[in-house]
């Protein structure tokens, strides 16, 4: 598979390149603040950079008819509309978290909340000091799995890649469910699965859950 990275020189860009190269995939498009280096036509473009970069990313996907794996957070409605339009021409996977564990947790929460429907629920998320958006896209994703609005508490400290704790409470007992991303590698592995999934797919919007669980 030939692939491109938007945000190539960033921390996630470097992690993505490492994971993809270990599987023998060829990096043919590099995009960062210094410009664009085009070596060949990519099958898939990976973008974990910023919402501001999305218009350029969309243009590149259209130019090469390349699928898009988008892990950028803090997207607004205008960005989502751009993705919907792009998905008419190429296959797109957009997710706020490409950790397999988080997406398994999301599915679990959607079932658990049916049993604990009268319990209090709150979410606590912790990320590194450089993360700009709060609450995190992942916390919002987990809230959506609960099917209702719940309090979300955001901490920005040190170099934490990402901790998410969902706390259920009732009189006399609590349940805490925690997911911890130990390194950015987990997100790069998820991006790899999504990219390989997209190769040969018809245009359309695909969820990361479809990548993991298929049609279940």
Curated annotation (Swiss-Prot):
SUPFAM superfamilies: Glyceraldehyde-3-phosphate dehydrogenase-like, C-terminal domain, NAD(P)-binding Rossmann-fold domains. The keyword NAD applies. It catalyses: (S)-2,3,4,5-tetrahydrodipicolinate + NAD(+) + H2O = (2S,4S)-4-hydroxy-2,3,4,5-tetrahydrodipicolinate + NADH + H(+); (S)-2,3,4,5-tetrahydrodipicolinate + NADP(+) + H2O = (2S,4S)-4-hydroxy-2,3,4,5-tetrahydrodipicolinate + NADPH + H(+). Pathway: Amino-acid biosynthesis; L-lysine biosynthesis via DAP pathway; (S)-tetrahydrodipicolinate from L-aspartate: step 4/4. Keywords: Amino-acid biosynthesis, Cytoplasm, Diaminopimelate biosynthesis, Lysine biosynthesis, NAD, NADP, Oxidoreductase. Its main location: cytoplasm. Is stable for up to 48 hours at 80 degrees Celsius. Has a thermal denaturation midpoint (Tm) of 95.7 degrees Celsius. (S)-2,3,4,5-tetrahydrodipicolinate binds at residues 128, 137-138. GO terms for biological process: diaminopimelate biosynthetic process; lysine biosynthetic process via diaminopimelate. The keyword Mitochondrion does not apply. Is inhibited by high concentrations of NADH. Catalyzes the conversion of 4-hydroxy-tetrahydrodipicolinate (HTPA) to tetrahydrodipicolinate. Uses NADPH as a reductant with much more efficiency than NADH. Homotetramer. HAMAP family: DapB (MF_00102). This is 4-hydroxy-tetrahydrodipicolinate reductase.
């Amino acid at each position: 598979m030939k692939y491109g990275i938007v945000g190539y020189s960033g921390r996630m860009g470097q992690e993505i390149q490492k994971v993809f190269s270990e599987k023998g995939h060829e990096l043919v498009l590099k995009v960062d603040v210094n410009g664009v280096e085009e070596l060949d036509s990519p099958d898939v473009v990976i973008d974990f950079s910023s919402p501001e970069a999305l218009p350029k990313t969309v243009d590149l996907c259209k130019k090469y008819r390349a699928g898009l794996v988008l892990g950028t957070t803090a997207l607004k409605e205008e960005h989502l509309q751009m993705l919907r339009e792009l998905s008419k021409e190429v296959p797109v996977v957009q997710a706020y978290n490409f950790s397999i564990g988080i997406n398994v947790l999301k599915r679990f929460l959607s079932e658990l909340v049916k049993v604990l429907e009268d319990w209090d629920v709150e979410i606590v998320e912790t990320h590194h000091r450089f993360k700009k958006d709060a609450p995190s896209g992942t916390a919002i994703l987990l809230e959506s799995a609960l099917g209702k609005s719940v309090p979300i508490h955001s901490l920005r400290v040190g170099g934490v890649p990402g901790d998410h704790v969902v706390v259920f409470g009732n009189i006399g007992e609590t349940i805490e469910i925690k997911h911890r991303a130990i390194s950015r590698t987990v997100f790069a592995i998820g991006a790899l699965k999504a990219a390989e999934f997209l190769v040969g797919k018809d245009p359309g919007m695909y969820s990361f859950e479809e990548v993991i669980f298929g049609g279940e």
